[in-house]
Amino acid sequence: MSSLRLLISDSYDPWFNLAVEECIFRQMPTTQRVLFLWRNAETVVIGRAQNPWKECNTRRMEEDGIKLARRSSGGGAVFHDLGNTCFTFMAGKPEYDKSVSTQIVLDALSALGLKASASGRNDLVVETADGVRKVSGSAYRETKDRGFHHGTLLLNADLNRLADYLNPDIKKLQAKGITSVRSRVANLVELLPSVDHQVICQAVTQAFFDYFGEQCEPEIISPSAYPDLPGFSEQFARQSSWEWNFGQAPDFSHLLDNRFTWGGIELHFDVERGVIIRAQVYTDSLNPAPLEALACALQGTAYRPENMAATCQALITAFPEQQNELQELAEWLEQSLR
């Protein structure tokens, strides 16, 4: 019986694919070597310790229907589309070695006629006429008895869109999270015009088989053909939840300010695990009472635009004479935080 396992996802849902990855990683025998091949529709994928409000242009993402997905490994934020092929290698310890999986990917590229090399921050690079360009980035995760290496190969990604979503709006965030390093990148189709997702998957699969001298039958998985993984539905629900993707952000502070016809306002927030734990308001409004009430009411509220706007609107009952001001404030809050 082969010690290898090969899974190929037909789903483009990042939450589905990351849930598959997590379940396999937790449940695989430590004697097994796993290769999982997948790709995502338009998504910003952030590292386990990152702050999405700092890393991402969340307003633009929502307008364009771009998903946010938090992975369980460290590292920086990346933009995925169907021009990226994603790979995950998993193995038990002591056999797990990220240099082995890196070599398998390099062997796959070499078989396609492209010489690449490993570089610094977990990247694979190639020499081009315009200099060194990154074609692959990776992240890693280890537990006591196993580890995984996952990454992407840029095949035909829309590189112009990287900056659209990875460069945040200018917000006064003082964050304890990690800011991504932007890298100079290139698509493999610029160097290998005939390469596509299927071609690269076949090359990586063959390099995987060749390295270990074994083969196995691929398992094709999709939302209509769920993987046989205990607890998958629960993991899928968690992976797609706001609590995981946003609520796991590192603690941070945020300042919002604006001037309305009725006065200026500054709102200071301290946020932990996606929830406002402290809110302060400063204003030169002639009637600060509803704003002071808002600061109190926001404590314990999820740091979500719709929640904060609803909290503001709920105060209209207590302050009917300030209905217009509170409505204007609610609309501003919802717009500013997207």
From Swiss-Prot:
Catalyses which reaction(s): L-lysyl-[lipoyl-carrier protein] + (R)-lipoate + ATP = N(6)-[(R)-lipoyl]-L-lysyl-[lipoyl-carrier protein] + AMP + diphosphate + H(+)
Alphabetical GO CC annotations of the entry are: cytosol
Q: What is its main location?
A: cytoplasm
Q: Which domain of life is it from?
A: Bacteria
- State which Enzyme Commission number(s) the record gives: 6.3.1.20
Q: Which residues does the record give as (R)-lipoate binding sites? A: K134
Q: Which key words are in the record? A: ATP-binding, Cytoplasm, Ligase, Nucleotide-binding
Enzyme class at the top of the EC tree: ligase
Q: Which PROSITE patterns match?
A: BPL_LPL_CATALYTIC
Any matching Pfam family: Lip_prot_lig_C
Q: Where in the cell is it found?
A: Cytoplasm
BPL/LPL catalytic domain segment(s): 29-216
**Annotated Gene Ontology MF terms?**
ATP binding; lipoate-protein ligase activity; lipoyltransferase activity
What GO biological process terms are annotated to this protein in UniProt? protein modification process
SUPFAM superfamilies recorded: Class II aaRS and biotin synthetases, SufE/NifU
* UniProt-listed InterPro entries: aa-tRNA-synth_II/BPL/LPL (IPR045864), BPL_LPL_catalytic (IPR004143), Lipoate_ligase_A (IPR023741), Lipoate_protein_ligase_C (IPR019491), LipoylTrfase_LipoateP_Ligase (IPR004562)
Further notes on this entry?
A: In the transfer reaction, the free carboxyl group of lipoic acid is attached via an amide linkage to the epsilon-amino group of a specific lysine residue of lipoyl domains of lipoate-dependent enzymes.
Among PANTHER family, the record links this protein to: LIPOATE-PROTEIN LIGASE (PTHR12561), LIPOYLTRANSFERASE 1, MITOCHONDRIAL (PTHR12561:SF3)
Identify its protein family: Belongs to the LplA family.
What's the subunit arrangement here? Answer: Monomer.
According to its UniProt entry, what is the function of this protein? Catalyzes both the ATP-dependent activation of exogenously supplied lipoate to lipoyl-AMP and the transfer of the activated lipoyl onto the lipoyl domains of lipoate-dependent enzymes.
Mind telling me what this protein is named?
Lipoate-protein ligase A
Give the organism the record lists. Answer: Pectobacterium carotovorum subsp. carotovorum (strain PC1)
- Which taxonomic lineage does the organism of this UniProt entry have? Bacteria, Pseudomonadati, Pseudomonadota, Gammaproteobacteria, Enterobacterales
